[in-house]
From Swiss-Prot:
Name of the protein in question: Aspartate 1-decarboxylase
SUPFAM superfamilies: ADC-like
Function of the molecule: Catalyzes the pyruvoyl-dependent decarboxylation of aspartate to produce beta-alanine.
GO biological process: alanine biosynthetic process; pantothenate biosynthetic process
GO cellular-component term (any): cytosol
Recorded catalytic activity of this chain's protein: L-aspartate + H(+) = beta-alanine + CO2
Native source organism of the sequence: Staphylococcus aureus (strain MSSA476)
């Protein structure tokens, strides 16, 4: 059986920009992407903690060290600058792969700096 499991999470990032007139996507600081192994053009699910919106888009790599989290195109209507978001990817794994799967989670501070990396083996509560 193949199951869809969380693979990576950027937890509690803050939206730094919103650009309605861009073609679409989310731009994320390349350093953050590398820390959690998210690739440019990869599909991501986004949850806005401020208004409850949930949506999907794809990733564009942003400038390293910028802390940039910019929602582009139609997705920009679902956020405001300063909103706290959770950005996730998923992987389809078989039962054997699941046994050794440890998602990478980057916990962010208010400046979009990683303050903790969690390599989840089991369910972990992050406040």
């Amino acid at each position: 059986m193949i199951r869809t499991m969380m693979n990576a999470k950027i937890h509690r990032a803050r939206v730094t920009e919103s650009n309605l007139n861009y073609v679409g996507s989310i731009t994320i600081d390349s350093d953050i992407l590398e820390a959690v192994d998210i690739l440019p053009n990869e599909k991501v699910a986004i949850v806005n903690n401020n208004n409850g919106a949930r949506f999907e888009t794809y990733v564009i790599a942003g400038e390293r060290g910028s802390g940039k989290i910019c929602l582009n195109g139609a997705a920009s209507r679902l956020v405001e600058v300063g909103d706290v978001v959770i950005i996730m990817t998923y992987a389809q794994l078989n039962e054997e792969e699941i046994q050794n799967h440890a998602p990478k989670v980057a916990v962010m501070n208010e400046d979009n700096v990683i303050i903790e990396m969690i390599h989840e083996k089991e369910n972990t509560i992050v406040l």
